[in-house]
Design a protein with these regions (language model features):
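C-terminal structured domain segments
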Residues: 572-574
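Inter-blade linker and blade-boundary elements of WD-repeat/beta-propeller domains
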Residues: 458-473, 511-516
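Detector for outer-membrane/organellar transmembrane beta-barrel domains
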Residues: 494, 499, 507-523
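Extended C-terminal subregions enriched in glycine
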Residues: 517-518, 529-531
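Mobile, glycine-rich extracellular loop/lid and propeptide segments
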Residues: 92-427, 433-457, 477-500, 523-530, ...
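Contiguous ligand/interfacial binding patches
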Residues: 568-569
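Long amphipathic alpha-helical scaffold regions
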Residues: 378, 470-475, 518-521
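Long beta-sheet-rich domains in secretory-pathway and surface-associated proteins
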Residues: 1-92
Length: 605
């Protein structure tokens, strides 16, 4: 089989064939995986006639080449082997098609051959241009290479705005390839509901997702909010042809939902999705032919609950709905259901098994648990969630909630301000392969979660969690981390950019390095560029009261700042900043959303 670096292969099916009446169980292990390639699962037990699948993933650090992967089956004294010829291929062209580069949300662009620690400095690197647009760019821009537009091949930068517009630019020339409005006839963008979180208008807030294989030319998917002439609000899922910007068949799809529940704001035994009460802030997740959406409120304006929805990529029809707080009663402070999903604009994370991971915000959590350790009423406010998509149906599969979650919710110190990042497979001190995720919110702690056993809820301790780093982020996280060379990088509110190395599947309990500068509210979501494991650069945007600063650091020593956009004379590299901006790197350039453009940084001519 073949794998592309940064990609996931088709499942490999293993079957134990019974001979001479054999009916035992065969324990299968595998060996020979090349560096940077992981398998899930790595061990399994086969019964005759009951096949199981193994999925291979080539991470960003994988190298192109071939390998022989050996499956060894043992049952009693019997041993049998089978060999899989595995080819790891280099990525064909440059594509950044989803938030933070991939569904693990690690923010690692590993194919950068132009930008290096040697040439990123204010003498040779800076702002090349700004691509003007008609509103704020809160979503991360996306990038595709060799896109056919009007019979010509272009690299393309996909940009969406809070004015409800979507653009394609040629990032090399700065020319506009197409522009479309997602607003319906006689509609405007939504007002900001008197809330300063997304202001002064709400159009397209979420980072879209691109599927280059969909339809004749590929497609870009996003959610847009609007308001009609009768002051009714609309949320719609759009699918645009990547080459033309035209709406594809079935697009747009009006978003509506109900879910059984009797909590605050319910009607006749159901929670009903009110499009005016919500914003699609998180980045969209495309996984196994389904597009997943998560919803947040406007400044905690009740009533609202936590909604997760799935839509068919092919039809844009809704396939599944999960409400995270359907039965939350009306209570003081942060009760009333609530439990929204916003994560500072980070994308919902997804693993190779089809599970979704995210953190939800303050809201009702039922501390009365059923026999499986789940909230008896199905209310999961202020939790680190794992949601199964088996059969394209959303269902809570596991979770972690802190022992003091109620007091944290009451004090607005919940987990929901930060995003979840999935780590590559790691081996602990006992040789056990661990599948981990990392997340942090407002409470200043970093949580390292075992995705196979997240820890659930204990009212007196967090000991069931894989690892907790209390107070590691002095001001909390309104952002998410990035990952490079076995190190997690965080930039919390009012804190420095910090490097936490990983050894034996555990984070260092204190940072190995940190930046000299700190990041004011809301902190920063860093990204990383590298050529494989070499020439790494950590990129982060600082908000200085509306004036943005792009920083570049040496990942091996964050105290060594390579560049910042205030260094050049006469404001050459200045730009205005939005609150939750994630830098995107592709093909020798860095892209940063501003209040009315995308700032493009690269090597100066």
């Amino acid at each position: 089989m073949s794998l592309t670096i940064g990609g996931v292969g088709e499942p490999v099916q293993l079957t134990a064939s019974a001979l001479n009446g054999f009916s035992g169980t065969t324990n299968v292990s595998l060996s020979g995986l090349p560096a940077g390639v992981t398998a899930s699962p790595t061990t399994l037990s086969l019964s005759p006639g009951a096949p199981q699948n193994v999925t291979f993933t080539a991470g960003n650090s994988a190298q192109a080449g071939t390998a022989s992967v050996v499956f060894t089956g043992i049952s009693g004294s019997l041993t049998h082997t089978a060999t899989l010829a595995l080819t790891v291929a280099a990525s064909s062209g440059v594509n950044v098609t989803t938030y933070h580069n991939d569904n693990s949300r690690d923010g690692w662009y590993s194919s950068e051959t132009t930008l290096t620690p040697q040439n990123v400095n204010s003498n040779g690197f800076g702002k090349l241009r700004e691509l003007a647009v008609d509103g704020k760019v809160d979503a991360q821009p996306l990038y595709v290479s060799s896109l056919s537009v009007g019979g010509q091949s272009h690299n393309a930068l996909i940009v969406v705005t809070e004015h409800g517009s979507a653009y394609a630019f040629d990032p090399d020339s700065g020319g506009q390839l197409w522009k479309v409005s997602a607003l319906g006839a006689n509609e405007t963008t939504s007002d900001d509901h008197g809330c300063s979180q997304i202001t002064p208008e709400i159009g397209i807030t979420d980072t879209p997702v691109i599927d280059r294989t969909f339809g004749p030319n590929g497609a870009v998917f996003f959610v847009a909010m609007s308001k009609d002439a009768s002051s009714n609000y609309h949320q719609r899922l759009h699918a645009l042809d990547l080459s033309t910007g035209a709406e594809l068949p079935g697009s747009p799809s009006e978003i509506q939902a109900t879910f059984p529940g009797n909590g605050y704001g319910s009607s006749n035994g159901n929670q009903v999705f009110d499009p005016g009460q919500y914003a699609e802030r998180v980045g969209l997740l495309l996984m196994n032919g389904q597009i997943y959406l998560g919803w947040t409120s406007h400044c905690d304006e009740d009533p609202y609950t936590g909604w997760l929805m799935g839509y068919s990529e092919n039809t844009l029809k809704q396939t599944s709905v999960l409400n995270l707080t359907p039965n939350g009663p009306s209570t003081p402070h942060y009760g009333n259901g609530e439990g929204s999903i916003w994560m500072a604009g980070a994308g919902l994370a997804g693993d190779s098994q089809g599970n979704i991971f995210f953190l939800d915000a303050n809201g009702t959590f039922d501390q009365t648990l059923n026999s499986s350790g789940f909230p008896a009423q199905g209310d999961f406010g202020n939790a680190f969630m794992k949601v199964s998509t088996t059969g394209n149906q959303l269902a809570a599969a596991d979770y972690f909630a802190a022992y003091d979650l109620q007091s944290e919710s009451d004090a607005d110190q919940d987990l929901g301000s930060g995003g979840a990042m999935l780590l590559p497979d790691l081996t602990d001190a006992n040789g056990v392969t661990r599948h981990l995720a990392v997340g942090a919110g407002k409470d200043t702690n970093i949580y390292l979660i075992d995705r196979d056993n997240m820890g659930k809820f204990n009212p007196s301790t967090n000991n069931a969690v894989h690892q907790e780093l209390p107070g590691a982020l002095s001001g909390g996280a309104w952002s998410m981390p990035t990952f490079f060379n076995d190190t997690v990088y965080y930039a919390g509110q009012g804190d420095h950019l910090k490097a936490f190395p990983i050894a034996n599947a555990l984070l260092a309990t204190s940072p190995a390095a940190e930046s000299a500068n700190s990041f004011a509210y809301p902190g920063s979501t860093p990204s990383v560029s590298s050529n494989g494991s070499q020439n790494g650069i950590i990129w982060a945007v600082e908000n200085q009261s509306g004036a943005g600063v792009l920083h570049a650091y040496n990942p091996a020593n964050l105290g060594t700042e390579l560049y910042d956009s205030n260094q050049a004379a006469d404001g050459r590299d200045h730009f205005t900043d939005n609150k939750f901006v994630t830098p995107m790197i592709a093909n020798g350039k860095v892209y940063v959303g501003t209040t009315n453009s995308v700032a493009v940084f690269g090597l100066l001519p």
